[in-house]
Amino acid sequence: MMKHVLNKCLMGESLSVQEAEQVMEQIMSGRATASQVASLITMMRVRGETAEEILGFAKGMRAYARKFPAVIEGTIDTCGTGGDGLGTFNISTASALVLASLGVPVAKHGNRSVSSKSGSADVLEELGINIQASVEEACQMLETTNLCFLFAPLYHQSMRHVAGPRKEIGFRTIFNLLGPLTNPAGARYQLLGVYDEAAALKMGEALRQLGSEHSLLVTGADGLDECAIHGDTHVVEVKDGRCETYRFSPDDVGLPLGNLADIQVDTPAESAALIRAIFSGDGPQAAKNIVALNAGAALYACGNASHIAEGVHYASKAIESKRVFRYLQSLQQQGRGIKHA
């Protein structure tokens, strides 16, 4: 089958959802060779992956994922594609802490850094959160603390078959888009950061067909894979079986413009230090505001706010009152941390 698909892609043709799902089954089962995988994802990248191909690959990847038994109503994931090259701190991870402190169940799906300076796993480890929790431990954490981290390599072990080709070719491929679409806990609410508006549209269509309840796919100014504080944010909103697009600025939700430089870091340790500063009452205002902005958008996505501006208000109050900082400390005091905040 792989030879047929490769020839089809060589001719510039795209794959149907069914074909893409079958190809992913070949890849996940280890039946496709490394050279076949590299050739396929390179041709798809050059041509441009379609929404149907993204959907089929996501279905195939979900079928091979380790199942997460706990299903808590209203669970959300704050996840991004990475790859924006802007070197910002882990905004979606900080936003997840805000949400959990407010009682929203968050199943944070992520990995160590691949294309960024600090992956979600890297910064959580610095903050003292257990990233290597077993499935049972993660379930318990979600139920008792509202937050668990689903370390991608533990749940998507079949992805080992593409690790070599991805590393060797070194550029973004369809696999960069799949992580946010394959949350093991089946989170039907998402705030999903995407580095490119066109990719966000395709991923939004895939999420719609995968049964997302309500998701916001956001692309900030300069391709930031978060809601931006330094410019406008493009949104693909998936809700009620439809995809809609719009833009908004920080001013539209009651926040001033901030400087990109105030939210950039070089290492996971710097990212963790900035997150601690934000929640303890220090840190640049732009950093506080971008966390409130993204947490506010997530509160809207999971139905805990009637619009983004209202969510920003709730998130800002949680940060300013140090509710989030106390929550972070409580995670460690309960023995689930490995460092002190």
UniProtKB/Swiss-Prot annotation:
Species per Swiss-Prot/TrEMBL record: Shouchella clausii (strain KSM-K16) (Alkalihalobacillus clausii)
Keyword Magnesium: yes
SUPFAM superfamilies: Nucleoside phosphorylase/phosphoribosyltransferase catalytic domain, Nucleoside phosphorylase/phosphoribosyltransferase N-terminal domain
Binding site for Mg(2+) 1: S92, E226
PANTHER family: ANTHRANILATE PHOSPHORIBOSYLTRANSFERASE
Pfam families, sorted: Glycos_trans_3N (PF02885), Glycos_transf_3 (PF00591)
Protein name: Anthranilate phosphoribosyltransferase
Biological processes per GO annotation: L-tryptophan biosynthetic process
Gene name as annotated: trpD
Biological classification of the source: Bacteria, Bacillati, Bacillota, Bacilli, Bacillales
